[in-house]
């Protein structure tokens, strides 16, 4: 992520004392590239400021929302919180130092920062990318093993510790192979006195190319493969579950059409209500009545006392006092209200509505995951292609437009820090409610 001006001008910086002549021969004239972004410097300042503020505020909101409910956090939300933290580091370490080096054409932060800052830039970007891989792996595990025990907080801590360890290990060569080069010594101009460049000084081209290829594999190709495999598995699982429900609904419809008689024949074959209620009440109808709506009919007074209770002589007068769904059992002075039965048509309609909702959600998940993959691929591809091209054939980019092309590629990479809070936070149902509550609290305060 650091400004690799030296890659365009000198491919090999041998760390011996007799390299001044080689550097003078390798570097072009200072005026050839000095004014490459002069016409757009204010535009670049505004664009970098906008992207940096947007990325910083978005990731800060995600981090605050995750920390607000840290006692109820899941493994995915824990990883998303760490992703927001690493993206904040990317914004803080990459944007200001890169923009300053591009616009001022020199390194102004001292020799110690020349060794430290490229290392921190590389670690922050690499950790952010490795956390994306971890989120993809966790989602893949949840889809493939839904019945197994959920991942605990200890698994999240282990993943984060592994990610940061790998980040420090992979980027460890950068502090060693960076040095501060004086421009006066390099270009032989008195106007460039007291101006320095922070450049990579690898022992040979093979070391530099090997490091560039390793970063390409770890920071771009491997995450892209993991994201694609994980999200394809998620979409496939949702699609398989949806098709299974549709097939089961079609089978039920075929069984109903084949075995059930028509509504007209069923109405003709209906038995009278009183006869129906006199048949095996306990065996057939015990589940159709609600205990909450049971009521006891008043028993007639007088000579009927001490005898078996019977239904009043005029049951119509009693039934008129009850709800329309109530039934009177002959010979038993108790009334129950029948539970409403769901017809097969209503059940089918409910299942169809459920399938429609699942289809809508599956399309939403598919679009969101596809956009997530495309955002990562499009935002980081130009910068990695730029580094590979400048390592193998720097003549493809002219001296004057070198810094401008680099700024465009670098800004596209920085855009991922602005879009990650939206894709992983604001579109995440587990974090969306917390974000709304947090924004409301901030607005009220």
Swiss-Prot record:
It is a multi-pass membrane protein. One of its GO terms (cellular component) is plasma membrane. GO terms for molecular function: neuropeptide binding; neuropeptide Y receptor activity; pancreatic polypeptide receptor activity; peptide YY receptor activity. Keywords: Cell membrane, Disulfide bond, G-protein coupled receptor, Glycoprotein, Lipoprotein, Membrane, Palmitate, Receptor, Transducer, Transmembrane, Transmembrane helix. SMART domains: 7TM_GPCR_Srsx (SM01381). The chain crosses the membrane at residues 43-63, 78-98, 118-138, 157-177, 209-229, 369-389, 407-427. Pfam families: 7tm_1. PANTHER family: NEUROPEPTIDE Y RECEPTOR (PTHR24235), NEUROPEPTIDE Y RECEPTOR TYPE 5 (PTHR24235:SF10). This is Neuropeptide Y receptor type 5. It comes from Rattus norvegicus.
